[in-house]
Every structure is written in C-alpha cells, then in structure tokens.
C-alpha cells in the first residue's frame, strides 16, 4: 500500500511537470505571448517558456530605456537577455518600439531637426546591429492625434501631404534595415472611442505605400466592452484595412474573477479564431505586477490560476484553437507587398504611376495583377512592377495588387488614390485685378498649400491641389473694399469674404451690428481672423491691410494688431509672408476657358487631337480637354 502511494505520487509529479512544460498554444502558426514582469522574464512557479510562445519587452526595448541616460550612453542589457531567451526557446521576439512620443530620450527635445534625425538614424542603426533578425517590430506606437505622436516628428518629415508623412518615413527606415521583419503600427482604443481615427491613420500610411505589414490593437479598451461592439469594431477595422492584425497588449483589468472570466471567454475566441489575427500578446499575467490598478489584470494570483487563466489553458487545447489560421504561417513573413502611387491625390485625366513593391522570402513570384476598382488593368511579369492608371472620374479609386507565386499562392495589398478636377490657375499681380468681386483662392507662395475653411469656419492649410476641387466647400474668397465705410480710419483696408461653392449668398461670421455695419445673418462663410479669431471687431481680425509686392505676392496685415499672417494661426508675425491670389475657374466650375492671359489657339483631347477652335467651346460634349496647354473640365 505504501509502495502504491509512492508510485501514485510520482505519477502525479510527472503529470504536473508535463502539464507545466507545455506552452498554452499548440497552434504552429499563431502565438499566445506575454511580456516581461518588472524586468524579469521567468516569474512565479512556471517558467515563461512553459506558458507563452512569444515575448515582448514591457520597457526594455523602448528608446528611453536604452539611451535615456545620454546620447553616448547605451543600456542594452535587459533587451539582450530577452532577445537571447526568445532565440533559446525558438519563439518570436517583438521589438517594442522604435518611434513613440512617450518614453523617448528627453535630450531629443533640445536638438535641431537635423540632429534629431541623425539621432533617430543612429538609434535604428544600432538596434539593427544588435538584433538583425528580429521577427516583429512596433515601428510607430500611439500616433493617433491626442495619444502620443512623436514631438520630434518634424525631423521625419512632419505631417506632409498624407497628414502622417513622418510615420511613412519611419516605416521606410525600418524596412530598409529589417526587410524580413513584420513591421507593425500599434495603438490603443481601437475597438472603442478611436476606431475611426485608427482606420484613418493606418489607411493613409498604407495607401501612401508605407511598408507596413500589420496593425496592432492594444486592446486595453476591452475591459467592460460589449461583445457586439467588439465584434463590429474588429470587423470594421479589418474590412477597411485588409491587413494582418495583432492583439498586442490584451488585458482585462478587474478584481472580479467572474467579470474577468466573462470577457476572456467572450473575446479571446473571437480574436484568436479570426484568420487575419496573427497572434495575441497578453500585457502581463502575474497579479499585482501589471500596469493596471493594483495589478488587477493578472491572471495568476499568489501562484494560483484565476478562473480566466484556468479557462485559457482549457481553450488553448481545443481543436478550434489549435487549428485557427494565421496570415503568417509559421509566424514569419513570406511576402512583402506594398502599393505606392505617385501621390494620394492626382488630377483627373493625367496618368498616375503606381509602384508595386513585391518580394518573397522563399517563394518565387510568377506575376502581379493590378486592379483598379476591382477591374483588372494590367498583368506584370517582371520587376520592377510599375503600373499606370489614368482616372477619368472624380473621387476615390481603389488600387489592388495580387501577387501570385509559382506554387499558386496569392498575396494581396490595397491602396487608393483620389482624383480631382484641375481647373487651371492664373495668379493675380495687383489688387486692381481682384477688386471687381471675382472669386479667388489664397495659396502660400513656395508651398503646396491653400487656405480653406473648417467645420468651425476657421482657416487652416490643406493640400494645394484641393483648391482646385470644387466639391470642397470653403476655398474661394472675395475681396471687399471698405472705401465707403463710415469709419474713415479703415477706408483703405479690406474685408475678405469666404464663398460657398453653390453660389448661396456669402455672409458675415459675427453678430448683427458688428463689422462696421456690415449685414450679418449668423454662422456663415466669412474670413476674418485666421483660426480661432472670431472677427467681431477690428482687433479680432475683421479688417486687413493687403498689399501686393512685385514679384513676391500679396501680404496680409491685421490692422488691429499690426502683425502679419503666415499660416493657419492668428496674424502674429513682425515680418510679412507672401501669398498668391489666384483664379481657379470660379466658385461654380469652369464655364469657358478664360483662365489664360492670351487667346487659346484651339481645343484638344487628352491624346492631342484637335477637336475645335477656341470659340467653339460650347459645342463640345462634357469631358476633359486641353486648352492652351491646360486641362479644362467641361460639364
């Protein structure tokens, strides 16, 4: 009897050891990972590798942790240990993160843009030397406006045409150094509160051709999240982006065991079984040792499983968990496919070039099919894969590349361009030319930017080509002289009235009785100050001293402050900036080709075939024509 008890005990110990040494995920294609615990890898009764098969340093690979002590001070010790541990146990290591507006070295704040860029380059180069074969990288973290966009983003190109050029640059830099790594954009509140902003950001950098391979949803917002809301948001994001997804920082922060279990049981299968989900990383697992209140997201407490952990062990042994598909079989990236149009906004009627960057890790490309709006346009068989498309309709056009390898495997990538109508342009060269009330646009000299009106009737900069887009309200202005004003002190100055594009009466933004007895009817399209200057009187920017400087452009000085306008902020500068006042076909579109200063010699198709004389414009069918070298739209 005593011998039987001993044998039974040995059997139990053996069974326990076997259970403990088995990682929770038995799926060969997607991982269930975790992070370090207060700088330690193994923590608690079970070793890290006995539970998880992917690791992310909680802090050890953040720039501040590595180089926060000074430009010449590098501390790679913690990250080295984690990287080596992952290689020892043959599972993925994720570098978290290269570019983030939090936990970066604060000495960066004191550098010029040029030196900031040099520091970023050195940071990435050094990380590349240390970890040349890293499998995954959070290239940019939490850049949604209001989160933590990098304060040093101007060093990477600033907002630019996409609004996120600096992020595109960061991904290009990462891809140059780690072409085989899975490059990820990572952010929070993606399932609640910031879903649309997340989609907008990732869509714009994807469409700009950034070499982004996946998006990371941190998922801290899932505590208390309604299941329907979660499912709908996850589907909405995927339908918009059509890219691999990582659940990158999952936790359910609650002291209540039943609540934590409920959300684990509801949410984990949804994300894990989605074939576009490449893996799930929990953001800590030891109770009291996570970033949440009292560490209450931990699923092992005092060495024992909380109910959520017990369930997680059981779920990971099910066939559904074991057989769930992944966009990265074997947890590695086979295909790098990116679609890069020459610009996100292109003129109607002009050919736009599209570069399809395609590279396989082990396979061979047979051909690349290029689609526009789901219609096959070209089949490309040789690199470089360059396509061309001439949009003939205004609006958004969806681009898609489908790469087929010699074994028949297909890989897809989306992008898009927006086509606009280019009405042509003629810059005015004196105030006399704009005193007759004709509409004009205001563009910044030397910049591809134009003034426009936001929803709050304030001004800012938009892409210059949008000034030619009649569908966007608020790009056109009229100049109104105050020569007949009862206030003799302002008779040599001007009001700027902003027009609506449907020819509705332009009105004054202000209250009745203000603006030197000008009529007002409430909220309307009227340019007074710029951005947050509500023009209820002269000091708030209602009246401008406008001068034309030969060969340079127009200057705008607010007569209340005596300071000049430069940008989308108030007029606050001692020195003038220069602007073009230019005609762009009128507020209601082009009716006849009168934007040129000399008589057109004829009207041609886009293919160069002459179809009419200049005075026969009205006989032509609607379309896009070349008139004196410019594209003109006839409606």
Describe the role of every protein-language-model region:
Residues 75-89, 160-183, 193-259, 268-272, ...:
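Glycoside hydrolase catalytic-domain groove-lining segments
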Residues 23-58:
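Boundary/entry segment of secreted carbohydrate-active catalytic domains
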Residues 67, 126, 138, 142-160, ...:
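Aromatic-rich peripheral "rim/lid" segments of glycoside hydrolase catalytic domains that contact
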Residues 423-586:
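Lectin-like carbohydrate-binding module/patch detector with strong preference for beta-trefoil
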Residues 367-372, 589-635:
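C-terminal outer-membrane/trafficking sorting elements
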Residues 33-46, 63-77, 104, 144-148, ...:
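Acidic-and-aromatic substrate-binding clefts and catalytic sites of carbohydrate-active enzymes
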Residues 329-425:
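Long, low-complexity serine/threonine/glycine- and acidic-rich segments characteristic of extracellular
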């Amino acid at each position: 009897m005593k011998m039987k008890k001993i044998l039974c005990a040995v059997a139990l110990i053996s069974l326990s050891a076997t259970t403990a040494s088995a990682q929770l995920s038995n799926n060969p294609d997607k991982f269930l990972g975790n992070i370090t615990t207060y700088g330690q890898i193994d923590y608690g009764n079970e070793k890290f590798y006995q539970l998880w098969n992917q690791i992310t340093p909680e802090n050890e690979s953040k720039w501040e942790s590595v180089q926060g002590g000074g430009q010449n001070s590098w501390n790679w010790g913690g990250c080295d240990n984690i990287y080596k541990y992952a290689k020892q146990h043959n599972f993925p290591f994720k570098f978290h993160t290269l570019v983030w507006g939090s936990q970066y070295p604060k000495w960066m704040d004191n550098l010029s843009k040029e030196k900031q860029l040099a520091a970023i380059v050195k940071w990435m180069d050094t990380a590349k030397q240390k970890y040349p074969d890293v499998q995954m990288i959070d290239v940019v973290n939490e850049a949604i406006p209001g989160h933590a966009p990098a304060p040093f983003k101007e060093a990477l190109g600033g907002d630019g045409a996409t609004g996120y050029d600096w992020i595109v640059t960061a991904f290009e830099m990462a891809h140059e150094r780690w072409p085989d790594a899975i490059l990820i954009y990572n952010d929070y509140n993606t399932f609640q509160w910031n879903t649309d902003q997340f989609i907008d950001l990732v869509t714009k950098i994807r469409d700009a051709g950034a070499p982004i391979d996946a998006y990371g949803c941190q998922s801290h917002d899932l505590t208390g999240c309604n299941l329907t809301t979660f499912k709908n948001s996850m589907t909405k994001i995927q339908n918009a982006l059509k890219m691999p997804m990582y659940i990158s920082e999952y936790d359910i922060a609650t002291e209540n065991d039943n609540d934590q279990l409920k959300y684990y049981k509801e949410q984990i299968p949804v994300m894990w079984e989605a074939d576009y989900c490449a893996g799930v990383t929990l953001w800590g697992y030891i109770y009291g040792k996570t970033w949440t209140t009292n560490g209450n997201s931990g699923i092992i407490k005092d060495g024992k499983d909380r109910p959520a952990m017990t369930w997680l062990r059981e779920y990971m042994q099910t066939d559904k968990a074991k057989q769930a598909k992944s966009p990265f079989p074997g947890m590695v990236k086979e295909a790098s496919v990116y679609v890069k149009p020459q610009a996100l906004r292109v003129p109607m009627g002009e050919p736009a070039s599209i570069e399809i960057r395609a590279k396989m890790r082990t396979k061979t490309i047979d051909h690349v099919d290029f689609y526009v709006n789901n219609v096959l346009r070209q089949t490309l068989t040789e690199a470089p894969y360059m396509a061309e498309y001439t949009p003939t309709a205004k609006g958004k056009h969806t681009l898609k590349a489908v790469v087929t390898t010699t074994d028949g495997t297909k890989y897809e990538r989306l992008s898009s361009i927006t086509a606009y109508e280019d009405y042509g342009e003629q810059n005015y060269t004196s105030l006399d030319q704009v005193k007759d009330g004709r509409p004009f646009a205001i563009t910044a000299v030397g910049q591809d930017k134009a003034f426009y009106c936001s929803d709050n009737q304030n001004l800012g900069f938009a892409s210059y080509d949008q000034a030619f887009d009649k569908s966007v309200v608020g790009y056109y202005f009229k100049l109104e002289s105050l020569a007949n004003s009862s206030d003799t002190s302002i008779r040599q100055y001007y009001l700027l009235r902003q027009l609506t594009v449907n020819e509705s009466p332009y009105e004054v933004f202000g209250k009745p009785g203000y603006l030197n007895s000008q009529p007002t009817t409430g909220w309307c399209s009227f340019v007074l100050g710029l951005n947050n200057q509500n023009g209820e009187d002269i000091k708030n920017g209602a009246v401008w001293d406008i001068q034309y400087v030969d060969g340079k452009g127009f200057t705008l000085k607010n007569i209340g402050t005596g300071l000049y306008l430069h940008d989308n902020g108030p007029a606050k500068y001692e020195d003038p900036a220069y602007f073009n006042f230019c005609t762009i076909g009128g507020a209601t579109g082009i009716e006849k080709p009168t934007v040129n200063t000399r008589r057109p010699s004829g009207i041609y198709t886009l293919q160069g075939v002459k179809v009419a004389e200049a005075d026969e414009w009205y006989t032509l069918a609607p379309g896009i024509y070349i008139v004196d070298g410019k594209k003109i739209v006839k409606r």
